[in-house]
Amino acid sequence: MKFSSSILASALLFSASCSSAVAFSTHQRLVSLRTTFVSSTFLASTAEKESECSTAESTTTTISPEFEAARDQAIATLKAQLPPGTESKLEAPLAHFISEYFQSLSDAAASGAKNPDGSSITPQQAVKNMLTSLSYALKFGMGEGKFIFENVRHRAMRGADFNDTTTDARYEDEALKEKLGPDVTTDFYAAGCDFFRPSMDLEHSIVSGQDNLKKAMEQIEAGENVVFLANHQSEADPQVVSCLFETIGKEAGDFAAHVTYVAGHKVTTDALAVPFSMGRNLLCIHSKKHIDADPETKPAKSRQNMSAMNSMLGGLKEGGMAIWVAPSGGRDRRDVESGKIPIAPFDQKTVDMFRLMGNKSKKPTHFYPMAMVSYDLCPPPDFVEAGVGEKRNVRFTPIGIAICDEVPNIGGAEKRHLFTEKAEAECIQGYTELLKGLKMEKYIPEEYSS
């Protein structure tokens, strides 16, 4: 089931005060609804909808009464404001997303998980995070004020007041300031991390290969380039990288914020994904599947990809560029029969292209396979969907990253397949070890154990 523009429009009503006839700004709407949550009682439907999700095992934990009340208030507010006759069509996707998120934070609170400042995870935090996410999606993901990723290489929107080593001249542009409005100072990178971090069981998560990460950071510091060849498991993988690197230390956390992610069309067009993408350094590249899906737009998409390649080459020539790319071109999908989750195969041509760009840059470019375990955090659909707006699932779960040994960028064209095979094998090995360490052996494909 997909999120359409009309479905996202209901978020406006969800983030507005029930009794107000005044047109509020996004932030005013949030303040109004938060106040309403505290001061009013809503008649929420007590019937739980049967989950339509076929992407992961059903949540078996029980939501706490406090989180349940906050969730029901949120869903009731949404339902009460939907146009007559549209409830059944519009309510389910957003209600499912809300339910999933509140359940995950309830599980986090029950486990004793804490926020980075040591505070407890609360229903109020779930309300604030969800309302903020939906309001950003409404404001920047659709309609006249939709944020347009005008450049194939997007730089993270960290806010006009962000204290970095350089000044972001974009915030001097009057048109951008007008579009962002009160959010001109919003750090969308931090907002994305704040949304997903409570759903990550960081205490029981794993970051292995930290010596390799340290080496990669030193190479970046020396003006060289690093490419992480990763498997891809969830929409929240950029936040997974950031939040796990933060657990290592400030230096690693700062490094995560500077990584550039190679992204497909969905992250810049799906209304709920747009605000999270605004906070990331991106290279927007259409996958081969997406290019071939529509013959009429194929030439334009191919030109955009060429522009992205040229932009990436420019960054590599400058040096000090860290890139995260999933050579498979998409997320890992579970085997619906066995329940195992194999890594999607690395695409030879994709790996070749990044090696070529590294060589053409005339700067030393280093390649590190990166294994990721994040499937349970935001389980993807079991089958690839061409459109945007997939159903969102969220779980409280441990996650893991393994930075594997560097694969030397050597060898001619006749042996290029050996490089890809080596990188994929390293990723599979790291992935298998992570699953064992996280006590998720049930996901290990039989062929990985041989």
Which residues are covered by each model-predicted region?
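N-terminal chloroplast transit peptides
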Residues: 1-32
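Gly/Ser/Thr-rich loops at beta-strand to alpha-helix junctions
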Residues: 231-237, 267, 330-333
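Basic/hydrophobic alpha-helical interface regions
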Residues: 250, 257-260
